[in-house]
Amino acid sequence: MQAQIMNKIFEIFSKNNPKPQTELIYKNDFTLLVAVILSARATDISVNLATKHLFETYNTPEKFLELGEEGLKKYIKSIGLFNSKAKNIIALCQILIKNYQTSIPNNFKELVKLPGVGRKTANVVLNCLFAMPTMAVDTHVFRVSKRIGLAKGNTAAIVEKELLQIIDEKWLTYAHHWLILHGRYICKARKPGCNICPIKEYCEYYINTFSS
């Protein structure tokens, strides 16, 4: 995709939603990290429902250790992979207290050392908490970026690299939020809403599918 077209796409995203934010609901830095871990293979809606009451009482690593693994499971049992997620989160709390004085690390290498934190989770945390220009590639970002022509890769890691190369730095702080929201509400997997899409004239899928 040409840089000029890429810029047109993100100009439209920026005009329609200047400062998009994560739809995960959280109380502080720690609860955002927990929410992002829980969101793996789960929807933000399901995570928010599970954490609504959890975060009201338990919102620090110390309080999570008081709750314990079995106690945590009771709150998050509606979320996929809740057993392994509970185990990882409790282990993560111990490490945060011991090594980081309960603070969340602000660099990628330290974050991915934490239990339950992979590349995507680390990138989300760095972006949302520290405003770093990272590119967290989830299923929405992966699908949308390939469909509209921003990337061609067949893995999340390759797509991430492609997006960081093509997207102008001025857009990167919000780029993954725009792509996620576009995929969640307009460019859906099974039935993309091309009729309401604000960027369709620049989208490779739309041009190839509907242009005569």
From Swiss-Prot:
Q: PROSITE patterns this protein is in?
A: ENDONUCLEASE_III_1 (PS00764), ENDONUCLEASE_III_2 (PS01155)
Taxonomically, the superkingdom here is: Bacteria
Query: What keywords sit in the KW lines?
Result: 4Fe-4S, DNA damage, DNA repair, DNA-binding, Glycosidase, Hydrolase, Iron, Iron-sulfur, Lyase, Metal-binding
For biological process, the GO terms are: base-excision repair, AP site formation
Q: Which Pfam families match?
A: EndIII_4Fe-2S, HHH, HhH-GPD
User: How many and how are cofactors bound here?
Assistant: Binds 1 [4Fe-4S] cluster.
Give residues annotated as binding [4Fe-4S] cluster.
C187, C194, C197, C203
**Domain HhH intervals:** 108-127
Listed under catalytic activity are: 2'-deoxyribonucleotide-(2'-deoxyribose 5'-phosphate)-2'-deoxyribonucleotide-DNA = a 3'-end 2'-deoxyribonucleotide-(2,3-dehydro-2,3-deoxyribose 5'-phosphate)-DNA + a 5'-end 5'-phospho-2'-deoxyribonucleoside-DNA + H(+)
UniProt EC number: 4.2.99.18
Q: What does this protein do?
A: DNA repair enzyme that has both DNA N-glycosylase activity and AP-lyase activity. The DNA N-glycosylase activity releases various damaged pyrimidines from DNA by cleaving the N-glycosidic bond, leaving an AP (apurinic/apyrimidinic) site. The AP-lyase activity cleaves the phosphodiester bond 3' to the AP site by a beta-elimination, leaving a 3'-terminal unsaturated sugar and a product with a terminal 5'-phosphate.
Q: What is this protein called?
A: Endonuclease III
Source organism per entry reads: Rickettsia prowazekii (strain Madrid E)
Taxonomy of origin reads: Bacteria, Pseudomonadati, Pseudomonadota, Alphaproteobacteria, Rickettsiales
